[in-house]
């Protein structure tokens, strides 16, 4: 019997939370984004988007801002967090 992707994802997420790794990774990401000024930049971008398109709703603003915000994450932050995730996965997944 093989495990489907949704089940595997669910188990990984559950283990991340139970092991405390989710909180560690999340805190590292938040700290780095705050330190780099990313949060303020995204707030400014969102305000600007709201002023330009006054009739838009949350979903429309999110669809515009989210891709730009993701691009604004620095390479060093992206690599650091991805490295933490890879290390966590290597601990729990048998790749042989």
UniProtKB/Swiss-Prot annotation:
It is found in: Nucleus, Nucleoplasm; Cytoplasm, P-body. GO terms for biological process: chromatin organization; mRNA export from nucleus; nuclear mRNA surveillance; poly(A)+ mRNA export from nucleus; positive regulation of transcription by RNA polymerase II; post-transcriptional tethering of RNA polymerase II gene DNA at nuclear periphery; protein transport; regulation of protein localization. There is a cross-link at residue 68 (Glycyl lysine isopeptide (Lys-Gly) (interchain with G-Cter in ubiquitin)). InterPro entries: TF_ENY2 (IPR018783), TF_EnY2_sf (IPR038212). It comes from the Eukaryota. This is SAGA complex subunit SUS1. Its main location: nucleus. One of its GO terms (cellular component) is DUBm complex. Belongs to the ENY2 family. Keywords: Activator, Chromatin regulator, Cytoplasm, Isopeptide bond, mRNA transport, Nucleus, Protein transport, Transcription, Transcription regulation, Translocation, Transport, Ubl conjugation. Induction: The gene for SUS1 bears 2 introns, and its expression is highly regulated by splicing, translation and decay. The presence of the introns thereby play a key role for SUS1 function in yeast. GO terms for molecular function: chromatin binding; enzyme activator activity; transcription coactivator activity. PANTHER family: ENHANCER OF YELLOW 2 TRANSCRIPTION FACTOR. Component of the 1.8 MDa SAGA (Spt-Ada-Gcn5 acetyltransferase) complex, which is composed of 19 subunits TRA1, SPT7, TAF5, NGG1/ADA3, SGF73, SPT20/ADA5, SPT8, TAF12, TAF6, HFI1/ADA1, UBP8, GCN5, ADA2, SPT3, SGF29, TAF10, TAF9, SGF11 and SUS1. Involved in mRNA export coupled transcription activation by association with both the TREX-2 and the SAGA complexes. SAGA acts as a general cofactor required for essentially all RNA polymerase II transcription. At the promoters, SAGA is required for transcription pre-initiation complex (PIC) recruitment.
